[in-house]
Amino acid sequence: MSSLCASNCYPSSSSINLFSNNNNPTKPFLLSLRFASSNSLPFVAPLKFSTTNHVLSNSRFSSNRIQRRLFLLRCVSEESQPSLSIGNGGSEERVNVLVIGGGGREHALCHALKRSPSCDSVLCAPGNAGISSSGDATCVPDLDISDSLAVISFCQKWNVGLVVVGPEVPLVAGLANDLVKAGILTFGPSSQAAALEGSKNFMKNLCHKYNIPTAKYKTFSDASAAKEYIQEQGAPIVIKADGLAAGKGVTVAMELEEAFEAVDSMLVKGVFGSAGCQVVVEEFLEGEEASFFALVDGENAIPLESAQDHKRVGDGDTGPNTGGMGAYSPAPVLTKELQDFVMESIIHPTVKGMAEEGCKFVGVLFAGLMIEKKSGLPKLIEFNVRFGDPECQVLMMRLESDLAKVLLAACKGELSGVSLDWSKDSAMVVVMASNGYPGSYEKGSIIKNLEEAERVAPGVKVFHAGTGLDSEGNVVATGGRVLGVTAKGKDLEEARERAYSAVQQINWPGGFFRHDIGWRALRQKQVATKEE
């Protein structure tokens, strides 16, 4: 069989014209150093706020003055942060880190990187209101992350030693390709390797070629042929758009008519554009879903802790799918034996297969799994090429290792022998979303009492996703999923109690949340207790 990467529909960044040719580096906004009330660490905050476009802007500070502030930030950080070990890999260097993205996942990454002894300072583009105001990073909202030349220029100007790309879209577009070509260490796969998420057909073909356990499937570009196959297979059945569809490209059809409608919407009506020019028709798997993450350096992979999210919008796993309404870690369904099985049967063959196909994978490999009811073993549902959101929030709350150091090791191909340290505590995140999500929703509703929520108990952190500031400085909702109220506890029950206590403190009539995050794990524990 020929190389899968050679036939990949996502070309290398040198052959696509997704970025502008603007060679002018984007200037960071005006900075001010102050101390957060919750701890002794300083953070860089905006001095000027534009009421016309809801972004922080720059007007008059010189590069030298900004550099002096970053230097002061580094000095205080050196005195206040403990040293953490990641194992045998990595180096002792300290770097400025740029996180690409502006959601809850990126806020969690910034929060973890801020604690890293190997990190001098954390920048986030574009970031959001919560990332900036919490002091977890310096936000650079004016940096156009779709313009690779602007990002490269910014990194060179501010001596950025590591770029961490959060969302999948810039990865599929080839941002990592261009940064690596410019000599900038980048944690995130090339556009070719990102096809593991960017093309369902590519991923399924790789699984078939390298014997990776997944659901039976067939790919179609003709609606009539797809419907004929669906008629033969029967319902329930799964219909997936081949490309990126903002999390809306999967239909789990319980009836044949629903499956036919999904095929027509993608192949005939073109609701997902080019992302739906092919559909993958997949066997329905019955069981329990779980999320598995591994850090990959091109040849080696090390597992992260397990997590489980909640896709459906309503309590009891009802309603349409979302980007995720909550998560917890660890996930009891992924036992040590099953985690070993996933590494040996799914992760390692994928990493090896990608290398053999000529597109080595560097970044985080997120395997969406189904623990099959009939066999008790995991099958791969999908690959994502970035941290999950909201799973990243609970993982970063439990991580005790130096995140910057291990990501640098991954970028340099030095993960062999590296191990990570994790808190024995459990963590849970409850997502608060705008009323109407995942359908249409209004923006601009005011959110209050966020600081009170973080003070309700130890180990509580509110991660921001779709937030901004209005003209009076109030935090307002700007997206569908808006907040990730996260808490640690000695066990899942305590983490859940703290998270929901914090949620109750938040005054936001324009939002809603699920009331049953963690129900599967808690039910399993109750059953186990009764059996004892």
Curated annotation (Swiss-Prot):
Molecular function per GO: ATP binding; metal ion binding; phosphoribosylamine-glycine ligase activity
SMART domains: GARS_A, GARS_C
Reaction(s) catalysed (UniProt annotation): 5-phospho-beta-D-ribosylamine + glycine + ATP = N(1)-(5-phospho-beta-D-ribosyl)glycinamide + ADP + phosphate + H(+)
Main location: plastid
Keyword Plastid: yes
Gene Ontology CC entries for this record: chloroplast; chloroplast stroma
Keywords: ATP-binding, Chloroplast, Ligase, Nucleotide-binding, Plastid, Purine biosynthesis, Transit peptide
Pathways per UniProt: Purine metabolism; IMP biosynthesis via de novo pathway; N(1)-(5-phospho-D-ribosyl)glycinamide from 5-phospho-alpha-D-ribose 1-diphosphate: step 2/2
EC number: 6.3.4.13
Compartments reported by the entry: Plastid, Chloroplast
GO annotation (BP), single: purine nucleobase biosynthetic process
Transit peptide: 1-75
Pfam family, one: GARS_N
Claim: Nucleus is one of the keywords in the record: no
Residues in ATP-grasp domain copies: 204-412
Family in the record: Belongs to the GARS family.
Cited PANTHER family: PHOSPHORIBOSYLAMINE--GLYCINE LIGASE (PTHR43472), PHOSPHORIBOSYLAMINE--GLYCINE LIGASE, CHLOROPLASTIC (PTHR43472:SF1)
Protein name stated in the entry: Phosphoribosylamine--glycine ligase, chloroplastic
Protein's organism: Arabidopsis thaliana (Mouse-ear cress)
Taxonomic lineage of the native organism: Eukaryota, Viridiplantae, Streptophyta, Embryophyta, Tracheophyta
Gene: PUR2
